[in-house]
Regions:
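Acidic, metal-coordinating catalytic segment for phosphate/diphosphate chemistry
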Residues: 11-52, 57
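Short amphipathic beta-strand and strand-loop transition segments with alternating hydrophobic
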Residues: 2-12
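Short, solvent-exposed aromatic-acidic interface loops
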Residues: 38-40, 66-70
Length: 192
């Protein structure tokens, strides 16, 4: 027997998120339920994009730090943002990189939408690989960003070979670290 979704009940719906209870029948025929949080808007499409932006020839990656109320602390993350209706992931990546960091770059590739935390949400996120021309931002320059009024984003240029040390320093400052950064560090430790 295949797993079957029987019905879904919305418990709460807000501007950006909704919470629902999903009733399903598992592979053994047992009726079960699950609580989930979903993004609102853009049904059937990816909801957000996160950006791995490499500054060349400096071999640096752009990271941000901002307070995240659900985590209750400052988080170190890759730049990211929601895909607006009518936008492509590429357009969103260019816009969000500029708004959050002030950097302008070109999109090298975008993945299909992947799931950020499939045990909790159906949110689909696209990874945008971007390249920034470091000659436009010499001597470690960080341009003025264009963040929204509600944001308080700090921007970092981190040498790829120094990423592990940077993460340790941020942990020592009691910052949370986005799991995507730990994934990048793990791949780096494998020599990939």
């Amino acid at each position: 027997m295949k797993v079957r979704i029987d019905r879904s009940e919305t418990l709460f719906s807000g501007k950006f998120l909704s919470c629902r209870k999903i009733f399903y029948t598992d592979a053994r025929g047992i009726a079960r339920h699950w609580e989930a949080v979903d993004r609102t808007g853009n049904p059937g499409c990816a909801h957000a994009v996160f950006i791995v932006a490499r500054i060349v020839p400096d071999n640096e990656v752009v990271l941000i730090r901002q307070f995240r109320p659900p985590a209750g602390r400052a988080m170190v993350e890759f730049p990211a943002g929601l895909i607006d209706p009518g936008e492509t992931p590429e357009t969103t990546a260019i816009r969000e990189l500029y708004e959050e960091t002030g950097f302008e770059g070109k999109v090298l590739s975008c993945t299909a939408g992947g799931y950020s935390s499939p045990g909790m949400t159906g949110e689909s996120i696209v990874l945008a690989a971007m390249e920034i021309d470091g000659t436009c931002y010499p001597d470690g320059m960080i341009p003025q960003n264009h963040q929204e009024e509600s944001e308080n984003i700090e921007v970092f240029r981190v040498k790829i070979g120094e990423l592990a040390e940077f993460v340790k320093a941020m942990e020592a400052e009691d910052c949370g670290i986005d799991s995507k950064i730990y994934t990048a560090l793990t791949f780096q430790s494998f020599g990939w």
